[in-house]
A protein has these predicted regions:
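Membrane-embedded beta-strands that build the outer-membrane beta-barrel scaffold
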Residues: 1-9, 42-50, 56-66, 191-197, ...
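Short, glycine/acidic-rich beta->alpha junctions
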Residues: 1, 38, 183-191
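Segments forming glycine/polar-rich beta-alpha architectures that bind adenosine-containing cofactors
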Residues: 168-170, 185-186, 201-203, 208
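C-terminal beta-barrel architecture of Gram-negative outer-membrane proteins
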Residues: 204-225
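Conserved small-residue
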Residues: 32-35, 51-183, 224-225
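Outer-membrane beta-barrel translocator domains and adjoining extracellular loop/strand segments
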Residues: 16-21, 72-77, 217-223
Length: 225
């Protein structure tokens, strides 16, 4: 039995991003090298010599890898007049402490029993009123991006802003809240398995791949709904 086990760590910096610039320059953005991201994981390979005779050899191969990805520094959004850099808080689904492969999407809440419409989770700030009250609650109270809202509150000095969050279900996706859903495109484990058979000099090899875990998004199915 042959066994190989490897651990890897890679820090990537100077990634390619677009930075917004003044429209007076004649273009809206400028490609820049910025931000930092780390990748780390383990890889393994097993090879078992099941049959090893003069004329017949049979080997079984198995390999796999588990890895994760995380942003540790976001790109600069703009520079203040004194030259200090202000970094982006989010860029799409990317944010510090999260993987660029994390799903940042809406949460499906089932079907409305009365209308048959699909329901989606919507968060709102309880400090500005709830549903049907007299505190001026309206569509502007609903949070479109949950993680961005939390970052904005923390930047404003609000401690534990999550305590002000309330949620409800809406059939109108326009009120739904984008949020991390603890799912990633990255598989928990992926690799391959195969056999090598050698009989009197005639070799037959078979290889297959596998993946365990990882979540995709079916945009074709979405377009049909």
């Amino acid at each position: 039995l042959d066994v190989e086990l490897d651990y890897f760590y890679k820090l990537t910096d100077n990634m390619l991003f677009s930075r917004a610039v003044a429209p007076s320059l004649g273009y809206g953005s400028l490609p820049v090298n910025d931000a930092k991201m780390e990748n780390q994981g383990v890889e393994f390979t097993f090879k078992a010599h099941l049959v090893d005779t003069r004329n017949v050899k049979l080997d079984l191969r198995l390999n796999g890898a588990h890895y994760k990805n995380k942003m540790i520094e976001m790109p600069v959004d703009y520079y203040n007049a004194d030259g200090t850099a202000v970094r982006q808080q989010m860029n799409g689904a990317m944010a510090v402490g999260h993987s660029m492969y994390d799903h940042y999407t809406y949460v499906y809440g089932g079907v409305d029993e009365n209308t048959g419409d699909a329901l989606y989770q919507a968060y709102y700030d309880s400090r500005y009123g709830g549903l049907g009250d007299d505190k001026g609650n309206n569509e502007y109270n609903y949070i479109t991006s949950l993680h961005q809202w939390i970052l904005d509150q923390e930047e404003a000095g609000v401690e534990n802003p999550e305590r002000f969050l309330c949620d409800t279900m809406f059939a109108d996706m326009g009120y739904a809240t984008l949020q991390y859903v603890n799912k990633s495109y990255l598989p928990d484990l992926n690799g391959g398995v195969g056999i090598d058979l050698d009989v009197y000099g005639l070799t037959l090899s078979v290889a297959c791949s596998y993946q365990i875990g990882g979540y995709g998004y079916d945009y074709t199915y979405l377009s049909l709904m």
